[in-house]
Amino acid sequence: GKSSILKALYSEKKIICGEAKIGQTDLKQLKENEIPFLRRKIGIIFQDFKLLKDRNVFKNLEFVLKATGWNDSKIRKEKIESCLKKVHILDLINKFPNQLSGGQKQKVAIARALLNDPEIILADEPTGNLDPISSIEVMNVLREINESGNTILMATHDFSLLEKFKGRIIVCRNGEISEMDYDKLKIEKVYA
């Protein structure tokens, strides 16, 4: 259910009933030719990093900017360096994916999600393939991004992340979505 909701918000899955909006965009009324424009407003982070193996970090990020219409190479370079600074890996700009740890790859994926100054960031199990230390590093970066004003909607099954990085919690249960208080969720987890 968690990943399906994120896919619906990203317009990878069609919304059949109910209502969903990103900003002023009604996802149920969205036309096929409007999807690329919507996706420029959304940053997405998957648990599998999906980096291009034959390109270094700079070229991986530049590929996204070129694909979304950024034609000025000077502006692309500035945006890439700015996003890499935000996730604390500017020093890895010339490294290839096979030279990066899992946590570093995920930070590249987060930088990629920030490139187009998204209105919202969708993070689908962003620490799912990481060791505990890398998970904490990635979550700290996401917290910094959130505290700087970006909205992040994260799907996770990792209860320990909810304990360490508290925020608003939305629970998917039996096809229903509801907001839940952390303490109530903790009690339900204990007695489940």
Q: Model-derived features: where do they sit?
A:
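Helix-to-loop junction immediately C-terminal to a conserved catalytic motif
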Residues: 10
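Conserved ABC transporter NBD signature motif
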Residues: 18-26
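Conserved ABC ATPase "signature" region
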Residues: 25-26, 62, 66-69, 73-92
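Conserved ABC ATPase signature
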Residues: 96-100, 104-106
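A short, proline-enriched helix->beta-strand linker immediately N-terminal to the Walker B motif
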Residues: 115-119
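Catalytic Walker B motif of ABC-type/P-loop ATPase nucleotide-binding domains
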Residues: 121-124
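Helix N-cap at the start of a conserved alpha-helix in ABC-type nucleotide-binding domains
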Residues: 132-134
